[in-house]
Regions:
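Hydrophobic, aromatic-enriched interface-forming segments
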Residues: 150-229
Length: 331
């Protein structure tokens, strides 16, 4: 049996790690002939990362390329994948911004098994795995265990844990707790953390980390209360935005702000390198992020890159004010 060297490019959030870790979890049973190499990427960087990788010697020994939780923005990048890997590349993505481009390469795009369910990258991988012959070699118990984790990731990433009226309170809390734990660990430990949850199953992992989860929930409640007091409102592109700086809990703050202030059309949460956007339905924030922040996502939830450093600007403002105060005093 010929060995397969599969290169995976994926986003660096929970869904972005969940998708490749799911594949690695079933590797022994479903992909015994394969070796996986994962590169995690921030939003808006897939094209430049692929462009760099195409020129590397690694492409000569790579048999397949899988892209998860993101889609290249450039049709040229997709054509390059087609040219170098023919029918040996796949995209597992659900973001609306690049849906039209994925449709042009439909043969290489994994679609959800149930169109009525909002997909995530992890759920798309799961749907695809279930169509492969070796899937039945997984025990029923293991299938159920993995299906639960896939659903928790999907529910959080699509925000169904907040918006689906049919979801149980237990499942909502589990999805929230899983995501909380993910962001607690530094990025370099993200894959290891997600893999440990997939190895143990959610029930066992949650029981082992009950105190930590409670501590994180308490910390988040205080953080949101504090940061939602400092909102700057601005009118841009004909819409009213509320801007908040946050280094943590960006998605939660972005979701909560329009709820607390319904007059706002959208929340824009900034951190040193990125933005998170949430809409109340009056603006397509995916298009807004694509136009102004090299990003994208969904009509009601999106993200992008921030080219200015708000921390540096804030520090400089304090320095300028200090210089002015001290010079006035000398006079």
């Amino acid at each position: 049996m010929a060995k397969r060297n599969i290169k995976i490019f994926s986003h660096n959030d929970l869904d972005g790690f969940g998708a490749p870790v799911l594949v690695k979890t079933v590797q022994d049973v479903m992909f015994p002939d394969a070796e996986f190499d994962l590169t995690s990427i921030g939003a808006g960087r897939i094209d430049s990362e692929l462009d760099y990788w195409f020129k590397s010697p690694a492409t000569a020994t790579t048999t397949d390329v899988w892209i998860m939780d993101m889609t290249p923005d450039s049709e040229h990048t997709m054509q390059e994948l087609n040219q170098q890997f023919a029918n040996h590349w796949l995209v597992f993505d659900h973001h609306e911004t690049e849906a039209a481009l994925r449709q042009k390469f439909a043969a290489n795009t994994i679609k959800p098994a149930d169109a009525k369910i909002n997909p995530s990258a992890t759920s798309l991988v799961w749907d695809w795995l279930k169509t492969l012959p070796n899937f039945e070699r997984l025990s029923q118990e293991r299938q159920q265990q993995l299906a639960e984790l896939v659903e928790l990731i999907r529910a959080y990433d699509t925000w169904d844990w907040q918006n689906d009226p049919d979801m149980s309170e237990k499942e909502r809390q589990a999805a929230d707790d899983f995501n909380q734990l993910f962001w607690f660990y530094p990025l370099e430990y993200s894959e290891k953390f997600v893999q440990s949850v997939f190895d143990k199953g959610w029930t066992t992992y949650r029981q082992d980390n009950d105190l930590l989860i409670q501590t994180l929930n308490d910390r988040r409640a205080k953080y949101l209360k504090s940061h939602l007091k400092d909102v700057v409102e601005v009118t841009a592109d004909g819409h009213q935005f509320g801007i908040v700086y946050a280094s943590d809990y960006k998605s939660e703050i972005a979701h909560e702000l329009p709820t607390q202030q319904p007059a706002l059309d959208a929340a824009l949460v900034i951190s040193p390198k990125s933005i998170s956007l949430r809409s109340n339905g009056k603006i397509d924030v995916a298009k807004f992020a694509e136009t102004y922040y090299q990003g994208g996502g969904h009509a009601d939830a999106a993200g992008g890159r921030l080219d200015i450093n708000p921390i540096r600007l804030g520090e400089q403002a304090v320095a300028d004010e200090l210089e002015q105060m001290t010079s006035v005093k000398k006079e």
